[in-house]
Amino acid sequence: MLDISELKSYAKVNLFLHVLNKRKDGYHNISSLLSRIDLCDVITITESSKLEIIYKGLQSKEIVDDNILKLFTLLKEKDLIKNFNYKIIIEKRIPIGAGLGGGSSNVATIINVLKDLNIFKDN
């Protein structure tokens, strides 16, 4: 049985951020320097009968824009992932909405686990 625990998903701070030109797609090019800080969410992944995403801890009830759910929805829509029947528990320690990149860090950490577990289809 798979049990991956104590995955640390670190926060970051922008040491500087310069907004450059606006692109044709409406976004802006930026120049930035980031630094990882010693503050992290902790992620645990265990086998389950279906995909479950559970948030615990600091401000967990305030999560309205679930990046991890968006990730799995996109991967399934694009048919890029095999069945993923796991429970993902995220213990939130990074303050939500503080600009510390907690949600993005959580997604990046989970993508790395998916690669290690060979969950992606060969297409």
Sequence positions of predicted segments:
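ATP-binding N-lobe of GHMP and related small-molecule kinases
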Residues: 1-98, 115-122
